[in-house]
Structure formats: structure tokens, C-alpha cells
């Protein structure tokens, strides 16, 4: 069985979403098969950005409405990086918000962030054997 994981992220503006994810993490836009949907590749995953209006309903049977200010969700991306400070700098320059940095020299440091659309993600520094940064 062959499996592929695709991560789908709602954004209020497709062009801004593509700009952020390509600049922050090096994704490349592969297709825009229909209006309001962009397919990006990078980091060994396929990322689909879906343009969805703020205030629209995310599914039938819920009173929830889409909102793009910072929000909590039980699902987020962990992006493992060799150089945390460089990756964090690129993400912030592209529009990410750094919320907290957790320094752990023995196991790898991490930065808790959100994208410009309120979705949380973590940057986690890879460590080599012996505890040194990768």
C-alpha cells in the first residue's frame, strides 16, 4: 500500500498563504488546480492551501465560524530544522509570530510560533548523538 500525507490549511487569502509558506519554509507551488486551492511541495509533504472566507462555516452542523486571529487547535505542524535561529528568522521575516522559545541544549530547542493566519506551528531543532546541534 502506498500512502501520501497531505496537510490542508485554510487561509483567508490564497496569494498571501502561498507567499508565506514558500518564503518561510521553502515550499514550492506545484499547481492551482481550481480557484482557491494551491498545492505546494516541500519538507517531504504536500501542502494544500484553501482560500476560505473569514466568518464562513467550516462544516455542516457546527456553529463555529472560521477566524484567522491566533486560535488554539489540537493539531499543528512540527517542522524539524538543523539551525533553529536561521529557520526562526526566515519564518518571522515571512510573517510568522514567535510566541515562545524553549531552550534545551541536551535534546534540542524549539520555537512555538503562529503563521500570519493564526495557525500554530513549532520549529524543533534537530540534535546529533551526544546532544550537539545538528
Q: Can you say where each PLM-predicted feature lies in the sequence?
A:
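Conserved active-site tyrosine of GNAT-family acetyltransferases
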Residues: 17, 21-22, 91, 118
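Vicinal oxygen chelate
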Residues: 1-8, 28-79, 88-114, 125-134
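Short glycine-/small-residue motifs
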Residues: 120-123
Amino acid at each position: 500500500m502506498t500512502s501520501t500525507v497531505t496537510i490542508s490549511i485554510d487561509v483567508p487569502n490564497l496569494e498571501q498563504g502561498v507567499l508565506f509558506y514558500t518564503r518561510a519554509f521553502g515550499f514550492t507551488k506545484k499547481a492551482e488546480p481550481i480557484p482557491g486551492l494551491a498545492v505546494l511541495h516541500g519538507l517531504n509533504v504536500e501542502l494544500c492551501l484553501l482560500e476560505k472566507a473569514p466568518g464562513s462555516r467550516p462544516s455542516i452542523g457546527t456553529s463555529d465560524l472560521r477566524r484567522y486571529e491566533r486560535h488554539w487547535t489540537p493539531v499543528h505542524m512540527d517542522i524539524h530544522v538543523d539551525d533553529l535561529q536561521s529557520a526562526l528568522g526566515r519564518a518571522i521575516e515571512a510573517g510568522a509570530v514567535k510566541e515562545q522559545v524553549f531552550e534545551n541544549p541536551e535534546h534540542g530547542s524549539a520555537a512555538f510560533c503562529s503563521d500570519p493566519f493564526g495557525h500554530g506551528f513549532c520549529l524543533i531543532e534537530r540534535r546529533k548523538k551526544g546532544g550537539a546541534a545538528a
